[in-house]
Regions:
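Glycine-rich, proline-tolerant flexible connector loops at the mouths of alpha/beta enzymes
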Residues: 1-15, 67
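Active-site beta-loop-alpha junctions enriched in small/polar residues
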Residues: 1-2, 30-33, 65-67, 99-101, ...
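Conserved, mostly hydrophobic/aromatic
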Residues: 18, 52, 94, 128, ...
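Conserved beta-strand positions in the central sheet of alpha/beta enzyme cores
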Residues: 27, 61, 95, 151-154, ...
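Acidic/histidine-rich catalytic cores of soluble enzymes
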Residues: 84-180
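A short, acidic, amphipathic alpha-helical segment used as a generic capping/interface helix at domain edges
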Residues: 178-192
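C-terminal helical cap(s) of enzyme catalytic domains, especially alpha/beta-barrels
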Residues: 211-232
Length: 232
């Protein structure tokens, strides 16, 4: 709710909580818009890398410009090359997340993968089941995405009935039997192709801020159970 990575906790408090509860902090969000090559973006990147390092996070997410402006592939490739040395300096992994929104400058996971390879940087893909659903060509391109290049998968659900091009982050909830994203099917398809990595829930709906601890526990357990039943 605070808009800060650690809310009102110090870096040391976060580290101590992680040790106490045996939690590994895999990633924090996010460099935006990573494919705008500016001093402001570079400073934001360095600030978030310091934050990730301070709390012991392993990775930092990079999200593309999402305002309807076109960004040439060459510009995105250059941005990857510009930022990679910073990630290396701080010892943090980069996760590039294509955004499926119609106004996104990088919607395709396959294109993102190609740009990462062409830039010769050690970043990996972050696949999000919501954004996979929003991008019309995602299913057709799925077979071209190398599973070994995927570093993390974000999961959420949408029950809202409006067309996919009208969906926003505000409709993203935990998983239910009425999920329109096909998140369980996406997880099963990734596992069938050998994805050995981590899945993480990323709902955004405003009502989540009102949930109690019991609500959070129930929703996580129900979502995990849905995935396990589907992938059994």
């Amino acid at each position: 709710p605070s808009g800060k990575v650690t809310d009102d906790l110090s870096h040391q408090q976060v580290r101590e909580l992680a040790v106490r509860y045996h939690i590994e902090i895999l990633t924090i969000n996010a460099v935006y818009p990573f494919n705008r090559r500016s001093e402001e973006v570079r400073q934001l990147t360095e600030s978030l890398l310091k934050e990730a390092q301070a709390i012991g996070a392993k990775s930092l997410v990079l999200c593309p410009l999402n305002d309807g402006s076109e960004v040439p592939a060459s510009e995105t490739l250059g941005a990857l090359r510009d930022l990679a040395p910073l990630f290396a300096f701080y010892g943090i992994h980069g996760l590039v997340e294509p955004l499926g929104f119609p106004q996104s400058s990088l919607r395709s996971a396959h294109q993102a993968q190609t740009l990462i390879h062409d830039a010769r940087v050690p970043f990996k893909l972050l696949i999000d089941t919501f954004h996979h659903h929003l991008y019309p060509q995602a299913a057709d391109e799925f077979s071209q995405v190398e599973v070994a290049d995927i570093g993390l998968v974000h999961l959420s659900g949408v029950d809202d009935s409006r067309p996919r091009e009208q969906l926003t982050d505000a409709e993203r909830i935990m998983l239910t039997p009425k999920d329109r994203l096909g998140t369980c099917e996406q997880v099963k398809a990734l596992e069938a192709r050998g994805y050995p990595g981590v899945d993480a829930f990323e709902p955004f709906a405003p009502e989540l801020a009102q949930w109690s601890e019991a609500d959070i526990e129930r929703e996580i357990e129900q979502s995990i159970a849905l995935i396990q039943r589907h992938c059994a």
